[in-house]
Amino acid sequence: MKNKFLLTTSILGILLFIASFNTTYGQKKSHGAANKNFIAANWKLGVQMWTFRLFTQQESLEKTANAGITFIEAFPGQTLDKTGKEVFGINMTAADRKKLKGFLKQHHAKIVAMGVISPVNKEDWIKAFDLAKEFGLSYITTEPIKTHWDLIDSLAGVYNIKIAIHEHPKPNVYWHPDSVLAAIKGHANIGACADLGHWARSGLNPVDCLKMLEGHIYGVHLKDIVTFGNKNAADTIVGKGVIDFAPIFAELKRQKFKGMFSIEHESNWENNLPDVIETVQFYNEQLKKLQ
């Protein structure tokens, strides 16, 4: 009888262990799948077209396609193609816009954002929002003058297109998150475009900056630099410079960031597509580690 009791107890113990293991494993697996699904659904990888500023928009779209990227952040002033002098911007004609839509369709690409722009008056801001609406943009990257904060917040609400304040290095007025937060205060449609490289150039820890701007980040400029705290530091391939990206991605995951990472590579201008492709690979590797 005693042996039978011990056997029964042992079997029950084993079954409880198996059940506990399966529950724990299932929870971890479910949590990992949820993380993977959230990132896949809410994180976009794109290219800030300034990266290919030496080329036309048509050529740049071909390059982004070769890098496996379909999302872009357009910049004003980029020539559309080699047939003329038409450029991307608020004064594009209907014919220019139709041409650009054709290029986008050809490469299955979408403009998610544009910038960095700083219109000087209400009329130009309205033109900017009209252009953004026509191409289905999510946000406009800008460094607006203070007297325009109320105006652009109002327009952003009307057009349902967010304003993302960019941060060039000091002495730019927006070099520190404090100044961006000042613009955000009382303006529900104004947030931030987190430029990781420029923060590092200004001697700021990007993770600390992200924490300060939690809940207000609409986009990220994904770049790396060779020297911390030097506003003239050169760009390098993301992951090969001074910026530690693992905690950056972890922090954005913690914040449940929803938006686009725009690769902005301001180096090797004439032949930087391989650098962009390497950045894409680095980004994908980092995402695997998050899951």
Kindly give the residue locations of the regions a language model identified.
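Histidine-acidic metal/acid-base catalytic patches
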Residues: N3, G26-M49, R53-F71, Q106, ...
